[in-house]
Amino acid sequence: MTVQRFALPVDRLTRLIDEHQFDLYNDPMPTMAALDGYLGDTRGALFALAARIVVGAVADIDHLVHHAGLAQGILHLIASLPRDGARRQLFIPLDLLARHGLGQEQVFAAKATPVIRAMLAELRGQARQHLDHTLELAREAPGGVRPALLPLALVSRDLVRAERRIDADPFQPQLRSRLATLWTLWRAARSPAFRER
């Protein structure tokens, strides 16, 4: 069994499962702090488990994988807005909506207003900060951990694309070419940022 073979921490897997219970209901994400915890225990946990499988137990990477999970998770939250909004499920924290003078119903209306665009720009800015911090921390991390961070190459590419297309309708799904995905991963796997030292 994979858990035993790689000595994966069962408590981390349990938290991952427990946090995903939130996905089953239409309760809104209450605060940015709650989103931080959710993404840390879901997306961040996957990066931590991948690192554990690749190099074994590594000390002092929790901060690194937490930021990696936040960068990937925030960008995924934005990309999933069309699907989640159609299901009346909201992962954008209520306190962020309130700070921009928005309510849930305005998001569910699926109209790309300037206020919604500003709120999403703030989220993209946070994703950018977490991604930049992760890549900075990865430079000092043990070299074997870097391949486990390879999905961040897609986060970086998608974030650049989103930052360039600020006038795109956030409620229309943005399709990602499979060939472009493979090309991005192939190129990143050969770059110093993601290669073992």
Q: Predicted segments — roles?
A:
Residues 29:
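Glycine/charged-rich beta-loop-alpha catalytic/anionic-binding loops adjacent to active sites
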Residues 2-21, 35-48, 58-73, 78, ...:
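Catalytic cores of Mg2+-dependent Asp-rich isoprenoid enzymes
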Residues 23-26:
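Short membrane-interface loop/juxtamembrane segments of multi-pass integral membrane proteins
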Residues 49-53:
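Alpha-helical transmembrane segments of multipass membrane proteins
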